[in-house]
Design a protein with these regions (language model features):
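Conserved SET/PR-domain catalytic core that frames the SAM/AdoMet-binding pocket
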Residues: 42-58
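Basic phosphate/pyrophosphate-binding loop/patch that engages nucleotide-derived ligands
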Residues: 61
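Non-catalytic, conserved peripheral segments adjacent to functional cores
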Residues: 1-46, 64, 71-114
Length: 114
């Protein structure tokens, strides 16, 4: 999620399979802090629209995954917010205990710090 230049996102898997997860980070929303998960793959053909104000992350479920992002605004790395993937408050059940994380994901903050 970006503080400045918020984005709607459209996610499509061109190759492979991912578990895609979003969390509602809109403070005035009835579903604030709730998450939603969906499996996207090249075989099921599902795509996923993510509105502004949602945190977004995914887990690759196959050895090779190619994911296409469509965004309504430019990426602004300085305004990106990363929340800890296994924040206990979010109660997201990931199918792995020790995922391979990017440097950015390793530095995620608590959801309560947003």
């Amino acid at each position: 999620m970006q503080k400045k230049n918020p984005q709607d996102k459209y996610i499509l898997v061109l190759k492979g399979k991912i578990l895609d997860v979003v969390v509602d980070a809109r403070k005035n929303s009835k579903t604030y802090g709730k998450h939603y998960k969906v499996v996207l793959s090249d075989k099921n053909g599902k795509s996923f629209f993510i509105p502004k104000g949602f945190l977004h992350g995914f887990l690759g479920l196959e050895k090779e995954n190619i994911v296409l992002y469509g965004c309504t605004n430019y990426r602004n790395q300085k305004s990106e917010i990363t929340v800890n993937w296994n924040d206990k408050k979010l109660k997201i059940k990931w199918p792995v205990k020790k995922p391979i994380l990017s440097k950015k994901d390793k530095k995620g903050i608590k959801f309560s710090e947003l």
